[in-house]
Amino acid sequence: SDLPIVSGAMGYISYDYGREKENVAARHPKEVDMPDLILCFYDNFIIEDHQEKRFYLVANGQTKEVDTLLDDVENTVAETYTLWKNGQIPGTKDDHSKIRVTPNFTKEDYKQAVQDMIDYIVEGDIYIANMTQHLTVESTRTPYDVFCSLRRDNPSPFGGYLNYGDLQIVSASPERFLQMRDGVVATRPIKGTRKRGATREEDAAMRKELEESDKDKSELLMIVDLERNDLNRVCMPGSVKVTEMYSIETYATVFHLVSEVQGRLAEDKNVVDLLEAAFPGGSITGAPKLRAMEIIEEL
């Protein structure tokens, strides 16, 4: 099928799940009390093709009468259209309400953590690592409002909104971690970003700067090598190849430097084996992966 999904699970897998899988001991309390993993299987999917302006209904093992199911879908679409027409869909209007953002690092502590990470690189423990921080946001806006704003103001190829009642997940990312079609596995790591220019000349200059950046190419090369190693653990011998290297991808607000690694999944392996081998992705950890994760947890 050319549809993005016809069956299967939807959900999220947290970084902490990957940390525990790699036996990296937690050295700090959790910032948020939430499950490490939630995957849900759904009977039905409504799929919207934005380019073709078509809707598809996919039903799996549905015992309900088909006509009744179609009526339910038509009613849902009609109600949604009415809300949209009346301006009642969340996130469709500009919201300039104030927000408060609180990081879990002070500026000085974060700078020190980055310096400590640089010291580990100089000492040869790691080649590259991803030092992030946790931001707590206080706002009157709902998570769905935030998702809609992200889709409108900074559209990304991959994103989602998951509502689990007391817990909502909002995601937006330009990066494809893993894809598998007909047994072929692909990962497309990103390392290297430049903002879009305000003019055509500025745009071309920023793109050229990224194309010629040895620093960004070196970072991406390290992650490509890591991803090749991860895929080789579950793919057929000799099948793992770098199919694309140092490509520039253009988005609404930025340029990204991207590569792609592909392999054919071994006959005795499945998607769970693939996730076990590759998660978390190298672009959000560093290389070597295990040591980078240990240092991230320390700092």
Model-predicted regions and their roles:
Residues 1-299:
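Extended alpha-helical targeting/anchoring segments
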